[in-house]
From Swiss-Prot:
Identification of the protein by name: tRNA pseudouridine synthase B
UniProt GO BP: mRNA pseudouridine synthesis; tRNA pseudouridine synthesis
EC number(s) given by UniProt: 5.4.99.25
Species the sequence originates in: Nitratiruptor sp. (strain SB155-2)
Keyword terms, alphabetized: Isomerase, tRNA processing
NCBIfam families: TruB (TIGR00431)
Entry-linked Gene3D superfamilies: Pseudouridine synthase
InterPro entries, per database record: PsdUridine_synth_cat_dom_sf (IPR020103), PsdUridine_synth_N (IPR002501), tRNA_psdUridine_synth_TruB (IPR014780)
Highest taxon in the source lineage: Bacteria
MF annotations from Gene Ontology: RNA binding; tRNA pseudouridine(55) synthase activity
Physiological role: Responsible for synthesis of pseudouridine from uracil-55 in the psi GC loop of transfer RNAs.
SUPFAM superfamilies noted in UniProt: Pseudouridine synthase
Catalytic reaction(s) noted: uridine(55) in tRNA = pseudouridine(55) in tRNA
């Protein structure tokens, strides 16, 4: 079975455990997902079966949109509710002040990633060190906050939505907002609403071609020649600029890369029929 769809991961289950349940329900062996969600988080998870598991790196999955709630006064080394260490009383805040501070984060956002994260340090994930109480130095990263909007405030909980670039840690964004308000804070809720055009719609099958980030190209060679991996030259292509392209036929497609006037296949014989 070849299928691409968006599932909705519930909270307090790992993305891998959720995929295992999906595989059992659909009775498939070859399956994968893109964009790991933290166990406590919920929301959209892109799932693929069969040949479509090869497509993840060619899909347009950005920007990503999240809805999240900050618990003001709560402190956690993981910046979420799974490792709460202390809770302090926080006086009620002015809603206008909260909105202004949230809105101030639009644009570039530079921060240190959470210690409990998948960032690599010396070839190992940061969370391996954090779980053992070892101190490590993570380098600052810069993300782009494309949009951010206040949703509501029910003291001591602040909910907002944000559209962000690849690799943004919402936990760090929430912590920075809380600090600017003058208090510690951690996430009590995190939901991924969308990844690019990918949104949850009852696991309906998607046409992968509509979600590719590559540009369509056209070739002089026959469908049969491309299917069998015939060598391509730059003169065979309609678009000759460096980049990655997809070539469509009625029942399959290929993905190629053009670099310094050389052409090579990245994928081929990907079925267009999906279930």
């Amino acid at each position: 079975m070849n299928r691409l769809f968006v599932a909705y991961k519930p909270p307090f289950v790992s993305s891998n455990a959720f995929l295992h349940k999906i595989k059992k329900r659909y009775r498939v062996k070859k399956a994968g997902f893109s964009g790991t969600l933290d166990p406590f988080a919920c929301g959209t998870l892109i799932i693929a079966f069969g040949a479509y598991t090869k497509l993840f790196r060619f899909l347009q999955k950005y920007p990503k949109r999240y809805r999240t709630t900050i618990w003001l006064g709560a402190s956690s080394p993981s910046l979420d509710i799974e490792k709460i260490e202390s809770i302090q009383d926080v006086p009620p805040l002015d809603e206008r002040t909260i909105k202004d501070i949230i809105n101030s984060f639009v644009g570039e956002f530079t921060y240190i990633p959470p210690l409990f994260s998948a960032k690599k340090v010396g070839g190992k994930r940061a969370y391996h060190f954090a779980a053992r109480g070892k101190q490590i130095d993570l380098k600052p990263v810069t993300s782009t906050i494309e949009e951010i909007s206040f949703v509501h405030y029910r003291h001591p909980f602040i909910t907002f939505e944000a559209t962000v670039s690849e690799g943004t840690y919402i936990r760090s964004l929430a912590e920075a907002i809380a600090k600017k308000l003058g208090f510690p804070g951690t996430l009590s809720y995190l939901e991924r609403l969308a990844e690019g055009k990918f949104v949850y719609e009852n696991e309906n099958p998607l046409d992968p071609v509509q979600y590719l980030r590559t540009k369509q190209n056209f070739v002089k060679k026959s469908k049969e020649a491309i299917f069998h991996g015939a060598k391509l030259t730059i003169d065979d292509l309609a678009y000759k600029e460096d980049g990655e392209y997809h070539i469509l036929f009625d029942d399959f497609f290929a993905i190629i890369r053009v670099e310094k006037k050389k052409v090579r296949y990245l994928l081929n014989q990907i079925p267009r029929k999906y279930q």
